[in-house]
């Protein structure tokens, strides 16, 4: 099969995207490997200014894939970032020699966005220091390669905490700000990207720039939620808050629609500090609600708890027992629900992470559970992001796709409070066009459980979910990398071409994260 070479930033003859398999509709492949032209001169230029490039197979192999485990590639070399000046030198040399630069933090992408198909991989984890904590102003300045859990450790020594961050211990701060960052308190506080007050950014041409809403605002708008296209974030100033443990409550539903309606009721009325939905298929739907303070919890119990239509754990168990007693042919499904409950639920109640009935560190608790009970060699997590009004429909349609492709799966739903003043940040991002007040996202995650599925099966599943987004005018949290063929279909040529023109102006050689979006 002949796949024609295309210039980065242009659309090839395939109606979906460059490098799509011609014989399989919307089947995506890894991009073609960069041919290595100019590599030796590029390395020589870097070493002349004191930037070390690791070229051993062992070092390069560490970065052969990402958390998704479905995309594989090898860089020609690896540079571990240690300073903005070093990153600047690298990008300047890359522009001269037209060497692709792939930036990687925690490597938690799932569609190959942080996998290098040749060129240089820039590992940001070498920049992982906390530079300053201002307890009075409630801000922190840190380097962008730091993991959120390391930032939390530093902050909590001062009785402080970040506002919202992904529920994963090995997400990097800079990588998170480039894609959004969703927490179970995002329906109240917004996504992680909205907590950034200022950034130090190295542009694709090597200029080191401090930017914020008031300084170099256009660059700030493009880098935040920019999927790494307009610069490398090297330092970040974030809003923070006093640390408080939280108290969790769980409500159980047998209906996705009812649970989502109750979730949105709480979000609209600011009735909880944390909220989200985690399911076992569509049979056991768990609405999680949590509070930072006794006063907020008491107000919820007085005004809102009685309006929820979910059950307590014991009541839901009785409901399920009656349901399956009348449907004995589904006893294997009931047995799976029971096994899953017995395996997963204790993770959220481990005594070492609780004190006086309060959860001390939600990131540790949720991250442990994710990797222990959802992680596998492949992480296939397509998603849909919609306005509040269309979310129920999106989840129900996505759920039907999950049932078609996999025996067992999990849905994770959460809201994101939007800032009207950050509308320019949200353009061509995971925030769906037209969403006001809140956007909502749902991850559709199959439970692999040791079974072997072909790459085509995974891809067909993802296509079926993403086609729903096209039909509904939605967006996605993961629309880059191997799924970038959907970008034009969702956002339209006019918007994509405008961003592509900005990308070409900012990155003349199209070297920075070239296979992620354009």
Predicted features along the sequence, with ranges:
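Conserved glycine-rich FAD pyrophosphate-binding loop
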Residues: 2-35, 41, 68-77, 99, ...
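Extended, non-globular alpha-helical segments
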Residues: 31-60
């Amino acid at each position: 099969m002949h796949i024609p070479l295309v210039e980065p930033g242009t659309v090839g003859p395939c109606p979906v995207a460059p490098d799509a398999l011609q014989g399989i509709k919307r089947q995506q492949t890894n991009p073609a490997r960069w041919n290595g032209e100019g590599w030796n001169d590029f390395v020589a230029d870097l070493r002349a200014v004191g930037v070390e490039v690791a070229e051993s197979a062992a070092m390069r192999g560490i970065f052969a894939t990402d958390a998704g485990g479905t995309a594989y590639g090898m860089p020609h070399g690896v540079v571990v970032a240690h300073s903005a000046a070093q990153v600047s030198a690298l990008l300047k040399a890359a522009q001269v020699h037209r060497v692709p630069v792939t930036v990687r933090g925690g490597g938690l992408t799932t569609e190959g966005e942080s996998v290098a198909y040749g060129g240089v991989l820039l590992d940001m984890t070498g920049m992982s220091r906390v530079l300053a904590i201002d307890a009075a102003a409630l801000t922190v300045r840190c380097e962008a390669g730091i993991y959120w859990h390391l930032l939390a450790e530093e902050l909590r020594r001062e009785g402080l905490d970040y506002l919202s961050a992904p529920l994963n211990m090995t997400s990097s701060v800079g990588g998170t700000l480039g894609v959004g960052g969703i927490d179970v308190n995002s329906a109240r506080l917004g996504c992680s990207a909205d907590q950034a007050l200022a950034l130090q950014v190295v542009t694709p041409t090597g200029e080191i720039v401090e930017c914020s809403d008031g300084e170099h605002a256009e660059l700030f708008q493009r880098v935040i939620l920019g999927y790494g296209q307009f610069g490398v974030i090297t330092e970040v100033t974030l809003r923070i808050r006093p640390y408080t443990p939280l108290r969790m409550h769980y409500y159980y539903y047998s209906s996705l629609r009812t649970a989502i309606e109750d979730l949105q009721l709480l979000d609209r009325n600011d009735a909880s500090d944390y909220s989200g939905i985690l399911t076992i298929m569509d049979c056991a739907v768990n609405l999680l609600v949590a509070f930072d303070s006794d006063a907020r919890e008491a107000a919820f119990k007085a005004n809102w708890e009685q309006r929820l239509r979910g059950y307590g754990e014991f009541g839901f168990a009785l409901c399920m027992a009656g349901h399956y007693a009348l449907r004995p042919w589904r006893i294997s499904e009931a047995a799976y629900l029971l096994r899953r409950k017995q395996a997963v639920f204790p993770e959220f109640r481990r005594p070492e992470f609780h004190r006086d009935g309060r959860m001390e560190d939600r990131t540790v608790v949720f991250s442990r559970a994710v990797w222990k009970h959802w992680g596998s060699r492949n992480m296939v997590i397509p998603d849909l992001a919609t306005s509040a009004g269309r979310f129920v429909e999106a989840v129900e349609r996505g759920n039907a796709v999950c049932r078609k492709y996999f025996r067992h799966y999990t849905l994770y739903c959460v809201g994101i409070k939007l800032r009207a003043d950050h509308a320019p940040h949200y353009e061509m991002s995971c925030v769906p066009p037209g969403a006001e007040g809140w956007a909502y996202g749902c991850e559709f995650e199959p439970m692999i459980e040791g079974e072997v599925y072909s790459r085509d099966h995974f891809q067909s599943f993802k296509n079926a979910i993403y086609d729903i987004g096209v039909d509904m005018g939605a967006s996605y949290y993961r629309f880059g990398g191997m799924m970038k063929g959907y970008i034009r279909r969702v956002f339209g040529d006019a918007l994509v071409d405008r961003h592509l023109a900005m990308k070409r102006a900012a990155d003349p050689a199209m070297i920075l994260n070239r296979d992620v979006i354009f």
